[in-house]
Amino acid sequence: MFNNSSKILFITIMIIGTLITVTSNSWLGAWMGLEINLLSFIPLLSDNNNLMSTEASLKYFLTQVLASTVLLFSSILLMLKNNMNNEINESFTSMIIMSALLLKSGAAPFHFWFPNMMEGLTWMNALMLMTWQKIAPLMLISYLNIKYLLLISVILSVIIGAIGGLNQTSLRKLMAFSSINHLGWMLSSLMISESIWLIYFFFYSFLSFVLTFMFNIFKLFHLNQLFSWFVNSKILKFTLFMNFLSLGGLPPFLGFLPKWLVIQQLTLCNQYFMLTLMMMSTLITLFFYLRICYSAFMMNYFENNWIMKMNMNSINYNMYMIMTFFSIFGLFLISLFYFMF
């Protein structure tokens, strides 16, 4: 639909919108940044040649407009309380703001729109939705001190993210439920420290990029494609599933490091109940990742072998292998660097 210059323009405006939200010192300014971000992201989603992407952009627009309306209304209520001394329950208003931000980020119990919308996106748009579009809402959530609502959202997110991915055959929905599960971990890290949240978000974004980069190159959208592709390239198949396990947080891969930090801090804060549920949910996600890996290595389907004529160029291959190296051995390298310096 757009040429590259248009995409660059919309991506730049989207980044500016997020920066306005993060640097704003008022809720009204934060709302304005979120709206700029929304209006620049929707043109990136829509595609005249793909009806599913157009439907996904409409779903995203309606959901985000609902959240933005609630956020604006709540911000006005807070301004009335602060400036006109009206008797407005501030904790109730903050709870409404928190709910609107959880809806914007796609956290449970406001996750209903997220997996269905992911199904209609290209991999690059899906990556932006799973990573960049979560920065502004999560930063605003960190300003609110409503622990009980955040605790409920964390528990529901990790459980729904784990159970929802069990019977999925679509890779995009699988990544969506994985994102909801990781969002629960990120929200729990927000309860402890903003720096731990930033570390977790960075590693999650990197691991998601490695997987979506591979899916985008080979146009992989369903599990049966994983079984039938890479029949002649065991190395690519092996590295792909190692990245899956790293994203799931299996030690000793890189994805275990942010979970390790969160587990350590939650233990120090005596949050044992929440931590137990989070770790159990992670075991469920690792179960379906391992099940996919086992099936893909044990079973080969040869119907679609003609599709393997599409070759991966050397630049993409080298880039993917470098990122995979850090994904698999990153924890060892960071530990070595820590002990040396």
From Swiss-Prot:
Membrane topology summary: Multi-pass membrane protein
Localisation: Mitochondrion inner membrane
Keywords: Electron transport, Membrane, Mitochondrion, Mitochondrion inner membrane, NAD, Respiratory chain, Translocase, Transmembrane, Transmembrane helix, Transport, Ubiquinone
Gene Ontology cellular-component annotations: mitochondrial inner membrane; respiratory chain complex I
Keyword Nucleus included in the entry's annotation: no
UniProt feature coiled coil, ranges: none
Main localization (coarse): mitochondrion
Swiss-Prot/TrEMBL catalytic activity: a ubiquinone + NADH + 5 H(+)(in) = a ubiquinol + NAD(+) + 4 H(+)(out)
TM helices/strands, residue ranges: 8-28, 60-80, 95-115, 121-141, 146-166, 195-215, 238-258, 273-293, 321-341
E.C. code: 7.1.1.2
GO terms under biological process: mitochondrial electron transport, NADH to ubiquinone
Pfam family, one: NADH_dehy_S2_C
Recorded GO MF terms: NADH dehydrogenase (ubiquinone) activity
Function: Core subunit of the mitochondrial membrane respiratory chain NADH dehydrogenase (Complex I) that is believed to belong to the minimal assembly required for catalysis. Complex I functions in the transfer of electrons from NADH to the respiratory chain. The immediate electron acceptor for the enzyme is believed to be ubiquinone.
Protein family (similarity comment): Belongs to the complex I subunit 2 family.
Record's protein name: NADH-ubiquinone oxidoreductase chain 2
Organism of derivation: Drosophila melanogaster
